[in-house]
């Protein structure tokens, strides 16, 4: 089983640890518009890992530094959403499970995503380290991220990033109009893009069960 699979056994907003095989449910964020860019270029995941390992050796990076960054992100998330969990206890433990079999954690989070993420400063901790090595090998992907970001425009993305090791990228937007505008910019640059929306956990499982019945 691939390390990407456990996420889809829970759905919604989750915390993934290690290679992604350890996953904990978090309070759901409000649905947000998203654009997924799927460039024609391919990226070798094994090569991306080798390049990242080489960069870590070159810069003297250690696993402890990554762990510290994860702890800072977790504190920022908990502070922003007032998620009080006993130390060492996974989110949602001991609560009644929903249709997904996953206990709810504090309910869906009200308020616009911009307030939940941007104003709390959590976006400053969101990063994909693969960008540092993948963009060196594939500069066109860095340009696609720039297009998705739309910096300096009224319809700028809340966040844009490489997805995993690539080559897909994504952008998050407050409004559908902003997402459609970003998708239009991609298509004008000859890059395939898809406008979609994130799903909270309950909606994810509702649609999964309906699809299974069909």
Regions of interest found by a model, annotated:
Residues 1-21:
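Contiguous, small/hydrophobic- and glycine-enriched helical/loop subdomains that border
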Residues 16-159, 174-187, 192-214:
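Conserved, helical-rich catalytic subdomain that frames metal- and/or nucleotide-binding sites
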Residues 161-163:
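Flexible helical/loop "lid" subdomain adjacent to adenine-nucleotide binding pockets
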Residues 166-169:
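Conserved glycine-rich beta-strand-loop-beta hairpin in the small C-terminal domain of fold type I
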């Amino acid at each position: 089983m691939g390390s990407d699979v456990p996420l889809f056994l829970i759905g919604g907003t989750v915390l993934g640890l290690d290679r992604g095989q350890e996953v904990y449910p978090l309070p759901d964020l409000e649905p947000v518009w998203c654009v997924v860019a799927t460039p024609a270029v391919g990226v070798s995941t094994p090569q991306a890992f080798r390049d990242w390992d080489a960069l870590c050796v070159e810069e003297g990076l250690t696993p402890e530094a990554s762990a510290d960054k994860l702890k800072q992100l977790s504190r920022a998330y908990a502070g922003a959403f007032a998620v009080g969990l006993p130390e060492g206890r996974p989110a949602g433990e001991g609560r009644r499970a929903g249709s997904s079999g996953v206990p709810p954690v504090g309910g869906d989070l009200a308020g616009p995503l911009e307030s939940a993420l941007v104003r709390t400063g959590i976006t400053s901790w969101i990063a994909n380290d693969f960008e540092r090595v993948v963009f060196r090998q594939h500069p066109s992907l860095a340009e696609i991220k720039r297009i998705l970001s739309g910096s300096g425009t009224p319809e700028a993305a809340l966040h844009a990033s490489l997805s995993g090791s690539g080559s897909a990228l994504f952008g998050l937007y407050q409004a559908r109009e902003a997402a459609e505008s970003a998708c239009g910019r991609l298509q004008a640059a000859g890059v395939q893009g898809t406008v979609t929306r994130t799903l909270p956990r309950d909606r994810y499982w509702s649609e999964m069960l309906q699809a299974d019945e069909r």
